Amino acid sequence: TVPAGRPVLFELARGDWKASFVRLARPGYGGKAAWLMAEVRLPEAVDWPHGPAQYSVDGLPVGAGTFALSGDHEDMFFGRDSRVTVDMKQDLRQSGSKGFVGKRQTRDWKWTIEVTNSHTQPVAVRVEDPEPQIGDSAIEVKVVAKPAPVVKDHVNTWNLTVPASGKSVIDYTVEASAPEDMHFIYGR
């Protein structure tokens, strides 16, 4: 029996879930934060209703929010990891031209993305940045990055293992050119 007028909690399930923890960073949007994310994979699909949840990492509370799960996988976010920072510095932003016949205008950008880990253990960090978008076939774009990103769904993704109390660096260059008489948006 359930008493009227009082909230009651029911345990829906109990179990150990396989999860890979990664810090997700998107420095091109102006932030230096890395967000702790668990990629949860369940042995079978479930369909649980929305409800309040409290989240903890290593036994420490990191936040509260609404939880729901439908399917056999979910990406769960646990808030910002203050011990992992990402700094995207623009080293070069210039325009110019090249060629005598069929002259083209050029744009060059170069960034250094530095990921710093203050944890005493190595951490997995996923850095994401939008792939340059070409709006006209006359525009040519070349991306050079070390390490090279994985490109999927117009997103450049770098999966790094950042050493304990250490740093990892991404060198990222975009070179673009277009016909001299074309309106060419500079971008960021």
Regions found by a protein language model. Give the residues of each.
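Intrinsically disordered, low-complexity Ser/Thr/Pro/Gly-rich interaction regions
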Residues: 1-112, 121-137, 147-150, 158, ...
